[in-house]
């Protein structure tokens, strides 16, 4: 038996392990175990237990406490409507167990790419290998009443998996989210066999795992190009597989407003790109629930006061410098226009917007992002009741607007997130967790460069990292701007502002702790990669996001990586990529050439 122990940093010992992100501690052998197609999952927490065998009425053997609706629909449903009550967290765990079993049993991932060509690597179907007949899950969690759908993702994510040579499986966790994380790892231990059932070649297995950071996110722009709910759900599936837990949906911008706001029907009706491309209230809730079922909290960003020109399609009187011919004087990108700062009508609009939106999203998330970036001063030269681009004049009006909106968020128990400019450029005195308590402060997201992270931390704010020089996924594809005839503003080679492309290796070795004093590191809540969508739509978004966001996911889960980790990471990340391409329909870009993955000779230099 080969026994390999992996404490944090993996070495290459002949066999490449299957797991992404890398667990905190991982040891394994080289014995094969089959997984029975009728394997039982026995789940126990402090309140109840159930046994799951197969998706049929006869296959669910309930110990007291089960729900009749699951007997009628044992697979559960991702689609929810506003009228339905929210599921409880125990149902999230049950659904995760069902998905895990279904995914393993129905996997199409045969890992031939990871063995020398024509090598017979699959176990013989000779009855000599033990079979896993039961997976026992013990969850030492709080009572279910203490977990709500929106906060359970903040629970203890630590878990352990023990698999013996004889096929005994024990999974232990301390919370529902810990159980879900364990199942996401458990699924990656198995492969499809060309002529038989699923198997793992790694027994015995011992895994102890927990994350480095609690906020592990992807920022997805759903406004500049049409990104539909089904595209976001597909993205959530990939996120969950690498233990990313926050989907930051940049939900509106100057180009379009795709969200239906029932109390302001004109907004999406006039500001969306097309009536068929509006996100209904039920679709938004369904996406949020779909994420929570998989351990991903979906929260919205409505950027204020910049990036709001789309509001002018419905309410032009609320927007200053709306659709100016020389847009570049009034905006970072076209079209120009920002909501007015000194307008009672704007405040009425914001109050109505928040009164509609926040009660709908807050039961399913604890965050709401109010933006605050790329705020153009010249715009307010054209606001009749203001007429100034002087920062000293504008600051009190900006401060008043942000404070007003944030007060409505806090009254609903929602934590505001803002972009870095509000505290670095405008020096607004927003409450931090030190001045307003753990839930009363804002979280600040740094984006322009890595030095901004340190500057935000020095002001005492909890901070999200993932800046343009490290984790921007849209960089390097070229500018969307066309040159005007005779203009030299846009020239060959027509680069975008953050070129070159941040490839997966670059994203993998980004160290968010570099140059951050130890005494400030506790303020780092985590990070996000960013998929801005000027040149992204559902056709190319998968390959633009993946596998690069997965590379960042390991940094967020396991901690900073180094160039010495890249060789091993290329094999593990490529295995993850093959798995989601084959089994989840994710059209992820390549990690490595097949020749290199087969390791017939070195692809190192």
Curated annotation (Swiss-Prot):
SUPFAM superfamilies listed in its UniProt record: (Trans)glycosidases (SSF51445), beta-N-acetylhexosaminidase-like domain (SSF55545)
Enzyme Commission numbers on file: 3.2.1.52
Record: glycosylation sites: 30, 342, 449
Active site residues of this protein: 293, 374
Subcellular location, record wording: Secreted
UniProt main location, coarse: secreted
UniProt xrefs under InterPro entries: Beta_hexosaminidase_sua/sub (IPR025705), Glyco_hydro_20_cat (IPR015883), Glycoside_hydrolase_SF (IPR017853), Hex-like_dom2 (IPR029018), HEX_eukaryotic_N (IPR029019)
Any GO CC annotation of this UniProt entry: membrane
First and last residue of the signal peptide: 1-18
Transmembrane segments: none
Physiological role: Beta-hexosaminidase that shows a broad substrate specificity.
Similarity field: Belongs to the glycosyl hydrolase 20 family.
Protein name per Swiss-Prot or TrEMBL: Beta-hexosaminidase ARB_07893
Originating organism: Arthroderma benhamiae (strain ATCC MYA-4681 / CBS 112371) (Trichophyton mentagrophytes)
């Amino acid at each position: 038996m080969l026994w390999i122990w992996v404490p944090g940093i993996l070495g290459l010992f002949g066999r490449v392990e299957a797991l992404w992100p890398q667990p905190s501690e991982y040891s394994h052998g080289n014995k094969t175990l089959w997984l029975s197609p009728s394997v039982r999952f026995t789940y126990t927490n402090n309140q109840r237990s159930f046994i799951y065998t197969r998706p049929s009425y006869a296959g669910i053997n309930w110990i007291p406490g089960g729900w009749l609706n699951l007997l009628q629909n044992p697979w559960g449903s991702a689609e929810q409507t506003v009228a339905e009550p929210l599921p409880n967290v125990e149902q999230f765990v049950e659904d995760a167990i069902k998905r895990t079993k279904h995914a393993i049993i129905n996997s199409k991932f045969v890992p031939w790419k990871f063995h020398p060509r024509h090598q017979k690597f699959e176990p013989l179907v000779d009855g000599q290998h033990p079979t896993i007949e039961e997976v026992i899950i013990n969850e030492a969690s709080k009572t279910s009443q203490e977990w709500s759908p929106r906060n359970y993702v903040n629970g203890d994510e630590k878990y352990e998996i023990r698999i013996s040579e004889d096929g005994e499986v024990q999974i232990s966790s301390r919370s529902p989210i810990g159980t879900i994380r364990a199942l996401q790892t458990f699924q990656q231990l198995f492969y499809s066999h060309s002529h038989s059932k699923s198997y793992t070649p790694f027994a015995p297995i011992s895994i102890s795992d927990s994350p480095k950071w609690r906020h592990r996110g992807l920022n997805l722009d759903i406004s500049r190009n049409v990104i539909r709910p089904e595209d976001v759900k597909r993205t959530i599936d990939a996120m969950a597989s690498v233990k990313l837990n926050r989907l930051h949906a940049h939900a509106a911008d100057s180009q379009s407003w795709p969200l239906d706001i029932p109390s302001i029907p004109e907004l999406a009706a006039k500001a969306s790109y097309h009536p068929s491309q509006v996100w209904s209230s039920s679709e938004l809730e369904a996406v949020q629930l779909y994420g929570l079922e998989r351990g991903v909290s979906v929260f919205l960003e409505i950027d204020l006061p910049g990036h709001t020109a789309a509001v002018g399609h419905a309410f032009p009187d609320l927007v200053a410098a709306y659709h100016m011919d020389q847009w570049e004087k009034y905006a970072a990108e076209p079209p120009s226009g920002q909501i007015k700062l000194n307008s009672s009508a704007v405040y009425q609009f914001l109050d109505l917007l928040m009164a509609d939106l926040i009660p709908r999203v807050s039961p399913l998330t604890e965050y709401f992002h109010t933006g605050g970036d790329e705020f153009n001063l010249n715009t307010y030269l054209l606001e009749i009741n203001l007429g100034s681009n002087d920062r000293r004049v504008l600051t009190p009006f900006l401060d008043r607007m942000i404070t007003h909106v944030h007060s409505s968020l806090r009254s609903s128990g929602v934590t505001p997130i803002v972009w870095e400019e509000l505290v670095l450029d405008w020096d607004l005195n927003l409450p931090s967790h030190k001045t307003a308590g753990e839930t009363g402060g804002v979280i600040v997201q740094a984006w322009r460069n890595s030095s901004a992270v340190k500057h935000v931390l020095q002001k005492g704010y909890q901070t999200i990292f993932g800046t343009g020089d490290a984790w921007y996924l849209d960089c390097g594809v070229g500018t969307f701007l066309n040159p005007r005839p005779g203009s030299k503003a846009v020239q060959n080679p027509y680069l975008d502002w953050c070129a070159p492309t941040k490839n997966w290796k670059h994203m993998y070795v980004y160290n968010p702790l570099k140059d951050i004093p130890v005494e400030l590191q506790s303020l780092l809540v985590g990070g996000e990669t960013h998929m801005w969508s000027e040149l992204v739509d559902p056709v190319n978004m998968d390959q633009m996001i993946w596998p690069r966001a997965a590379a960042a996911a390991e940094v967020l889960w396991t901690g900073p990586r180094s160039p010495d980790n890249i060789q091993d990471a290329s094999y593990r990340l490529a295995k993850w990529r093959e798995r989601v391409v084959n089994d989840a329909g994710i059209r992820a870009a390549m990690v490595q050439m097949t020749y290199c993955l087969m390791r017939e000779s070195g692809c190192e230099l």
